[in-house]
Every structure is written in structure tokens, then in C-alpha cells.
Amino acid sequence: MKPQKIRNTAKKSIFHESNALVIRIVWFAIGIIILFAVAVAFFAPLVSAAKKLDYFDYVSELRSNVLTAETEEFSLRAFAVEKEYPYAADGVKREMTKRAEIYLTAPAGDELAHVNFQVGGEKYGGEMSYDNVKEEYFFSVSADLSKADTVDFFVEYGKEQLTFHAVTVKKQTTLTPKIALDKLKENETELFSSLTDEHGFVGEIYLRLICEGEPYYYVGLITKDGKVRAFLLAADTGKVLAKRET
């Protein structure tokens, strides 16, 4: 009878160990489920907010058009911009104003220069200032060049009378600034989600059309901690060509 009792005792021991193992597995599974539920509850609002937000509302500097013209000795660039005032890369968007910025590169900077042009039936003009560091003339006025395909600029440089027929660098395939930003958000979903809280986007966005032979978009995400996450996009597809963080 003793061997039988030993076998029964062994069976009971194995049974209890099996039950204990099952219980541990069940509690482990419950723990995993709870952790997953907590993670979903924490991140879901952020992801949802990132999907619903219109990040274009956080653009605090916009360059939507670039027009260029050049001769053998001169080159002219005109930008359609919207900028906040006062201008500060501090991660906070402020009220913006539309401006036309005109840059003139000349053989020398020792002559007085005046520029005149017309857009939307309105005439604009004035004396251009000279930047000794950039070695170019500059003029800014409250005007909208965002939809202009061509603009004639009349420049008086010293005793010379110059006419520049400036043409936009945009092509039929060039994305609008808003669509370009949407493309970036699609490609950088995790980054945008990490920079979004229950109040919205935690910074400001610089969005500039640029031209280096071909049109591109520069996008800068500026947060309040001073970090700048910069992207170079193909203007016709929104594809990220380069990126860096400073």
C-alpha cells in the first residue's frame, strides 16, 4: 500500500504544480493585456490628434512663390512671403502679414537703386537698401505675389534703366505648399505624432519654396526647446530628399 500512496502523492504534486503554472500564465497574459490597454489609451489620443490637426495652421513663415529674372550683369528674385511679426524662431506662431520681397544682385553696391512694379492692379515701388554682407539690394512691401506667374520689375540703378521680366519657378506639377506639408506628415507620421499633444502641435513650421535649378520645398519644424527638424522635399512629389536636426 505504501507504493500506491507515494504514486498518489506524486500525482497530486504534479497536479498542483500544473495548476500553479496555468495560473501564472493567466496572470501574465492579463498583465500584458492591461499594459497594452494602457498604451493604447495613452497614445491613441495623440495619434488621433495628429490625424485631425491641420498642420498648415501652424505655419508661421510661408514662401509660396518665387519669380526670377537675370541679365548678363544683374539678377533679380522676388518672393511671395507671409511672416509673423515680431519675427522669432521660438516655436510659437504669431499673427502673419503678406509681403513681397525683392532681391537684386548688381555689379556693385555703390549706386542708388529704385524698383517699381505692378500686381493685381496696384502699383508698388521704392528705394532699395543694400546689404553689405549678402552684397545685394533689397526691397520689401505689403503686396501679394503668391498667384503671379510673371511680373515686370522696373529698376533704376544709378543712371541705368533696367526692365526685368520675372517668371515663376513653379511648374504645372509643383505641389501647393499645403499639399507638400501633408505629404511630409504622411512620410513622418511618428515624428508629427511625437510633436503633438492634447493642445495641438507643440511648435511652429517654416515652409518655403526654393529654387536651385529646380524648385524644392524647405520645411522646418521649430519647437519651443530650440530644436529645428529640417526637410528638403521634391516640389512635384513631396518626397523627402534630405533631412537633419539641429
Residue ranges, per PLM feature:
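Gram-positive cell-envelope targeting signals
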Residues: M1-Y58
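Extracellular ectodomain segments of secreted/surface proteins
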Residues: S48-P107
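Exposed beta-strand-loop-beta-strand "reactive/processing" segments of non-cytosolic proteins
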Residues: F139-A143, D197-A235, R244
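Short, aromatic- and glycine-rich surface loops/edge beta-strands on solvent-exposed regions
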Residues: S146-E160
